[in-house]
Design a protein with these regions (language model features):
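Intrinsically disordered, low-complexity regions enriched in Ser/Pro/Gly/Gln/His and often acidic
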Residues: 5-7, 19-20, 70, 422
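Membrane-interface motif at the C-terminal end of an N-terminal transmembrane signal
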Residues: 27-28
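Bacterial N-terminal signal peptides that target proteins for export
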Residues: 2-16
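Signature for phosphate-centric chemistry
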Residues: 32, 37-119, 123-315, 321-438
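Bacterial N-terminal signal peptides
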Residues: 14-24
Length: 438
């Protein structure tokens, strides 16, 4: 099935997946001698799967649509709502170059473009197409490489099962009673939006997100938290887009304040996306095919189609924050990494490594996320990428779990009614630095 689909990809790319161990920052590049010594003593990473969020985009609502939430006009963006910006595309290209630098330093990436081993898949939205094109160009510059995706007019059920990306909000969830930290963040966000405090705000007609009566009603509280999470993320995106600081949050929130406010986005997703009923509804299909890809690489026969040939060494999927939240729920983790308060930043990723050691296959899970200043500057060197390793379900807290234990534990968390056996017939698209506005 994969021979024809991936033939040109396999003739264009070569990528091994020896990746770093966990630390607070992505480790600095090793010297060739260090890499050779490590390769001789370390376990072999047979496959790495990277599920990454797209790059910096404009808010999904226009400034006019957002106007009712704030006392002052929202900034104008150089692209249509929801689209990747040129800054976001440049960031994804720089992030791809950072992965390239890291993997080349470990003799994991062939510098001459020849050979096989890597597959890049993107969701069908324009921002994901543009992100994949830019990331792949950064990873393999001048290689005339390709990524796989459906046309922008078609939904990809790997990323949005049944085109119901918001219907998992209706999945059973615990009754929402915002805690003290969330209420404090709501008050702080309202001060930023209103530009006032206390009685001075009484004359404003915009709906208040910190209204105690609304927060006492669990149904209303869920709606408030969803709106607040989206608005807080919009402010974060203004900073990440490198807008002039007086325009970011109307000059009323610095980077530290934005990092605190984005906790509302995390809280919203913890309730509506990461909670296991919602995660099973939205993430089962994607995780089923990720696990099938790992099985194929380990020489097993999966029940559903893998996403890449068995000899693939690296698989990169450009998805959304919702995909990362669904996977985090299925993995049973709260994916906060020290140094980045946003659980799902642009360019942030969850990584699954299939490791062979002493004749046995193991699975390990990691987060690699850029910091907020890194996104603003589009510089991903040094401590600008943070990493954390996670235990997997059923593994007793171990950071490297036998595949024979991790696989059935993860499969048991899937909803079989939300899994399609086949993989969409995606086509190849050329990698290039995306040209998407200013």
């Amino acid at each position: 099935m994969f021979a024809s689909r991936f033939a040109r990809v396999r003739s264009a790319w070569r990528l091994a997946a020896v990746l770093c161990v966990a630390s607070a920052a992505w480790p600095a590049a090793a010297s060739p001698k260090q890499a050779e010594a490590a390769a001789s003593s370390a376990a072999q990473v047979r496959l790495t799967i990277v599920v990454m969020r797209h790059g910096v985009r404009a808010p999904t609502q226009s400034p006019d649509d957002l106007a009712k939430y704030a006392a002052q006009p929202w900034p104008q963006w150089p692209v249509a709502p929801g689209q990747l910006t040129a800054h976001g595309a440049a960031g994804m290209q720089a992030l791809g170059a950072r992965y390239r630098q890291r993997w080349l330093s470990m003799s994991a990436l062939a510098p001459d473009c020849a050979g096989s081993g890597a597959v890049v898949i993107a969701d069908s939205t324009p921002r994901n197409h543009d992100s994949a094109a830019a990331f792949t160009e950064g990873l393999l510059p001048g290689c005339q490489a390709h990524y796989l995706a459906l046309p922008t007019t078609q939904n990809n059920p790997l990323f949005h099962f049944g085109k119901d990306e918001d219907k998992d909000d209706a999945a059973p969830a615990p009754t929402l009673h915002p805690d003290a930290a969330t209420r404090s963040r709501l008050r702080a966000l309202q001060r930023v939006l209103s530009g006032c405090a206390g009685s001075a705000c009484a004359a404003q007609e915009s709906p208040r997100l910190d209204d105690p009566q609304r927060l006492q009603d669990p149904a209303q509280a869920a709606k408030v938290l969803k709106t607040a999470g989206s608005l807080a993320e919009n402010l974060m995106l203004e900073y990440a887009q490198d807008l002039p600081l007086p325009q970011v949050a109307w000059g009323r929130a610095d980077a530290a304040a934005l990092q605190r406010l984005v906790g509302l986005h995390n809280a919203s997703f913890a309730y509506s996306k990461r909670a296991l009923p919602a995660a099973r509804a939205g993430g089962s299909n994607l995780l089923a095919h990720l696990l099938a890809t790992l099985q194929a690489a380990a020489g097993q026969a999966p029940a559903v189609a893998p996403l890449a040939p068995a000899d693939t060494r690296a698989l990169v999927l450009l998805g959304h924050d919702t995909n990362l939240a669904h996977l985090a729920g299925l993995f049973g983790i709260d994916p906060i990494v020290r140094g980045q308060s946003d659980a799902y930043p642009p360019g942030g990723a969850l990584l699954l490594d299939l490791v062979r050691q002493d004749g046995q296959d193991f699975l390990q899970l990691r987060s690699v996320v850029p910091t907020l200043p890194a996104l603003r500057a589009n510089r991903f060197d040094g401590r600008s990428l943070r990493e954390r390793r996670w235990p997997l379900p059923g593994c007793g807290g171990r950071l490297r779990c036998p595949l024979a234990i991790a696989l059935p534990a993860l499969q048991a968390r899937l909803d079989p009614q939300r899994v399609e056996a086949a993989v969409p017939a995606m086509t190849e698209w050329p990698a290039q630095a995306a040209s998407v506005g200013e």
